């Protein structure tokens, strides 16, 4: 009996460890277990501002104004369905010289989806981009950061480089601009100590639909741009890194 129980405990422990490793590989933004993904460059004085889940009406337009005031370029990972609903704003993002990336058509957790659904989400988003801005995306960020080998393989088959991040603003939570900026500042400081660039995850929209309140994110962006530039930080788009 002890042998049977002990074997069951060992099997359960192994299964738990395997599940934990799979979750880490699928959800931790800096994990490379499922294959190479672009995170950031090696210059600790470089940072990329990346914005997910847009376009989002006046919020995205105000963000474009803030970036222009600071002469900064950013990377926008747009949801295809939001682009379909607000094509004129997506075009404004592209016309301002920012880099546009694919964030899927409807923002599902792709790690749990079938291979057919994954391809539909990514190719559908790129088809919308071609119609609206005249070009497919060359970079892809999985919604929620959730991926598995099939997600990364499909992105590459469609000519896109998967991109994650190494600074999380946590701005999807109802927190203040000061808290968001503090999260970013701490993330940049950590990366600088480690001798690497910073890929900053922010949001100008939300996957629940248009009209998501993101003004604290915009205010935090202005704060970070002013402070980082004063300290010699250079802002790039993710294509500068690969």
Predicted regions and their residues:
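Charged helix-capping and loop-helix junction motifs
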Residues: 91, 118-122, 177-184, 214-220
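His/Asp/Glu-enriched short active-site or ligand-binding loop at hydrolase and phosphoryl-transfer sites
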Residues: 146, 152-193, 233-242
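Basic- and aromatic-lined ligand-binding clefts that recognize polyanionic substrates
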Residues: 132-146, 151, 155
